[in-house]
């Protein structure tokens, strides 16, 4: 749990920190499209190169981002292995009992693995360089045109901000509860898989209780400050779109064009 870094903001003055959060979000959406386009070795290598350049520009150690993968390693491994054996087309490379994996299954599993790594890296870059409040403002600004069809842009942005804000808090609460259970003699790594799952049940009840308590305290605090929704609200800092934001978005579009060329070339 200590390896969970997604949702944590790290203050800094890098060029990525200075970019408008609207541009970062738009780039995130474009990057997701790129992940589905990247279906061969060349395109995935290009995306990894692009991600490592972004990591360097954030002035945050690459090892920090790699550390964040540890909390997701089980999901990544399970999905990759499932994809490996779920694809039956292609030449059979190995078979045992009714399990078999093929060259196409291996290729698909590698692509799924790369997609997981890339999306986690990019999401982490977004959250460590952008405050939750800025992300909420960006979501609200992007969704503002949809207000004409009654889409609650402000409320969606507020929910996103609160969700990102409380991810590190929930992780810290989980660590605190697990340490308290260990002090009472609980071993979370002992026994078979079913026993290990059962050992986590005593964590869930106090974690849920703590979450509801925090949510109730937050609701009371918002009511005490007269919060009544987004209508008529002003901001202390307004978002400013600059030349570097346009340039950054243009670079992402160029990478998208190059991916499309390599995919169909």
Where are these regions (language model features)?
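Membrane-interface elements of multi-pass transporters and channels
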Residues: 37, 41, 45, 57-64, ...
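Alpha-helical transmembrane segments and their membrane-interface exit regions
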Residues: 50-60, 74-78
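Juxtamembrane/interface alpha-helical elements of multi-pass membrane proteins
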Residues: 72-186
């Amino acid at each position: 749990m200590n390896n969970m870094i997604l949702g944590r903001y790290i203050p800094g003055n890098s060029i990525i920190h200075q970019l408008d959060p609207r541009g970062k979000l738009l780039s995130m959406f474009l990057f997701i499209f790129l992940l589905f386009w990247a279906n061969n070795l060349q395109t995935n290598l290009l995306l990894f190169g692009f991600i490592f350049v972004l990591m360097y520009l954030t002035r945050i150690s690459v090892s920090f981002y790699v550390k964040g993968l540890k909390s997701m390693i089980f999901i990544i491994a399970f999905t990759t292995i499932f994809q490996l054996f779920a694809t039956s087309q292609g030449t059979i490379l190995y078979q045992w009992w009714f399990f078999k994996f093929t060259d196409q299954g291996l290729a698909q599993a590698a692509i799924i693995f790369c997609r997981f790594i890339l999306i986690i890296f990019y999401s982490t870059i977004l959250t460590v360089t952008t405050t939750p409040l800025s992300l909420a403002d960006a979501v609200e600004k992007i969704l503002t045109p949809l207000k004409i069809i009654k889409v609650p842009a402000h409320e969606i942005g507020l929910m996103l901000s609160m969700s990102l804000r409380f991810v590190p808090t929930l992780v810290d609460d989980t660590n605190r509860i697990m340490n308290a259970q260990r002090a009472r003699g609980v071993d979370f790594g002992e026994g078979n898989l079913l026993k290990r799952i059962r050992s986590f049940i005593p964590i869930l009840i106090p974690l849920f209780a703590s979450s509801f308590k925090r949510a109730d305290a937050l609701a009371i605090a918002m009511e005490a400050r007269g919060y009544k929704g987004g209508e008529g609200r002003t901001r202390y800092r307004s978002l400013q779109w600059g030349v570097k934001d346009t340039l950054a978005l243009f670079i992402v579009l160029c990478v998208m064009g190059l991916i499309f060329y390599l995919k169909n070339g």
